[in-house]
Regions:
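Active-site-adjacent substrate-binding region
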Residues: 110-137
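Active-site histidine-acidic residue metal-binding/catalytic motifs
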Residues: 1-74
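Active-site-adjacent mobile loop/cap segments within catalytic or ligand-binding domains
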Residues: 5-8, 18-22, 80, 87-95, ...
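Alpha-helical transmembrane segments
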Residues: 235-249
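A short, glycine/acidic-enriched catalytic loop
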Residues: 17-35, 92-120
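Cytoplasmic C-terminal tails of single-pass
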Residues: 250-273
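Extracytoplasmic/secreted envelope proteins and their assembly/folding machinery
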Residues: 41-44, 48, 71-74, 101-102, ...
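Juxtamembrane/start-of-transmembrane alpha-helix segments at the extracytoplasmic/lumenal side
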Residues: 214-234
Length: 273
């Protein structure tokens, strides 16, 4: 069976304050009670669901509210054999709440086409929400250790009141996840090819399993029929033997009736005298 296509999804930031001052945590952008870390994790889980439906193996750099070092995030992706790396964030701009829009960043030139595919997917799914598309931009300081196509996605500004309101809505989050998903699928046709190969292999394995189960059932039925045949055959032989014995018994000579009566009469006479 072919190996699944592996991707890494990185929900930015994470962790919560504890009584241990040495325990690090990073909420990301915070506006009131809304924290970037919670939004990015939710987006990652939605995106994972979409990818898994396509038989893609998804590695999350974090799957709960925990702090993970940047180097460890990449180590987890690399150890799993990820062939794409998508880091999810939301944007912010201090001092001007009117700044808005979608942006996709990439760390190195070899990730440019990947960034364009992700940006195109998001621009399409967020069009109905009237989100401005700022396009793609290179940021060499981002994820410099990666050796696979890598992007950082900033779909909206948490500091913009309108976009903040959208970020709290399920349909907007679904649209973000769908846009990133469509961009990933478009970026590498091998994702779809692997899906087809896996589907064929699974179908063949299922057919083989069903054939094996049917053969086992046939063998069991044959064995049962054989056992019943032996039992019935044995009973038939026993019946024939018993019937022959009964017939032989019925052909044995019997004393005549008058002899039996005379014998009884003589015994009666002797008792009188």
């Amino acid at each position: 069976m072919p190996s699944p296509y592996v991707v890494a999804i990185d929900p930015g930031h994470g962790g919560s304050p504890t009584s241990d001052p040495t325990q690090l945590w990073d909420p990301g952008v915070v506006v009131g009670s809304i924290m970037e870390k919670d939004i990015t994790l939710d987006l990652a889980l939605r995106l994972r669901t979409l990818l898994q439906r396509e038989r893609v193996k998804v590695v999350l750099t974090r799957s709960s509210d925990q702090y993970v070092e940047i180097s460890e995030r990449w180590n987890r992706a690399h150890a799993a054999g990820a062939r794409m790396f998508v880091s999810l964030h939301v944007n912010a701009y201090d001092g001007d709440s009117t700044i808005n829009g979608l942006a996709v960043f990439y760390p190195k030139p070899d990730s440019f086409s990947f960034a364009q595919a992700i940006d195109s997917g998001l621009a399409e799914t967020l069009k109905r929400f009237q989100i401005a598309d700022d396009g793609v931009a290179i940021k060499p300081e981002l994820w410099v250790r990666t050796d696979v196509p890598t992007v950082t996605v900033e779909p909206a500004y948490l500091t913009n009141p309108r976009e903040r309101s959208l970020l709290l809505q399920d349909d907007f989050r679904d649209a973000i996840a769908m846009g990133v998903f469509q961009g990933m699928i478009a970026a590498d046709p091998e994702i779809e090819q692997t899906k087809v190969q896996l589907a064929h292999s699974e179908a063949a394995a299922t057919a083989q399993h069903l054939a094996s189960a049917a053969a086992t059932a046939d063998a069991a039925r044959t064995a049962t029929a054989t056992r019943w045949g032996l039992i019935i055959g044995g009973l038939a032989v026993l019946f024939v033997v018993m019937r022959a014995a009964i017939r032989r018994q019925s052909r044995l000579p019997q004393p005549p009736a008058y002899r039996r009566r005379a014998y009884r009469r003589r015994r009666s006479v002797s008792r009188r005298y």
